[in-house]
């Protein structure tokens, strides 16, 4: 069914759709710079880093329209970090397991090279400017090590500035009895176990290998490990059968918004049936941005006369 809009409504709609396209293009650009990090390591300041971005994107210095996009979407979101970021974090001060290798799994330390770009935090969305998305990015001014678990030579789980920053709002809110869906390297359970007003933490994790590694090499280093109980199981199935009351339910079952969106939508349906406990979702702003892009794409096709079941490619 084709949608008919007034001229002013159509103008607003096209601004939304144009912003969505730029959001997606900038997101692809940022993903690519994290993959080709060596290109940016010569930068020594946010200004030089921004210049590298312009060079990487291939924007001519006289292309003011493209430069304006970079200025608006990216430049203000760049901020460097130093050693104090990790040095002052209680997890990093306390949890320093001895590296080991067991089968396909290896627990050890990876390194951010000086001026290597990375994602710093969840996206910032400006709902007053057509849902413009800015992704904070950063780099360290010196080489910095961080804990990582690799599987078959690929980093699978790690404790990075992005994980630290994106979890902090949920850590600040935590109190009482907490249900955690997904274990990882235990950053969130560790941080909330340090709080006096957090009494009990139940973690549901499906992967027995992850549980074993955590229990043997990481949990013994926790000062308040007595607060933490780990259950092997599927998070969705556990929620369907659960009879216990929790103050907060924190979901961390995905590596990124792309693989997390289907699980997030399932959990939102389950949340409707819970009369207790506040549900919280890691990277929720990014998950909602991903959903918004999908809905705007469907809406755009409807404007062009396509239905949800009729792709313009068929």
Model-derived regions, located:
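Conserved acidic residues
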Residues: 176, 199, 247
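N-terminal auxiliary segments of SAM/dcSAM-dependent transferases
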Residues: 1-140
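Conserved SAM-binding loop of SAM-dependent methyltransferases across substrates and taxa
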Residues: 185-197
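S-adenosyl-L-methionine
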Residues: 207-248, 256
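Conserved SAM-binding motif I beta-strand of class I
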Residues: 200-205
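C-terminal substrate-binding/active-site "lid" region of AdoMet-derived donor-dependent transferases
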Residues: 255-314
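Conserved alpha-helix/loop element of class I SAM-dependent methyltransferases that forms part
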Residues: 144-147, 161-177
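Conserved class I S-adenosyl-L-methionine
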Residues: 175-186
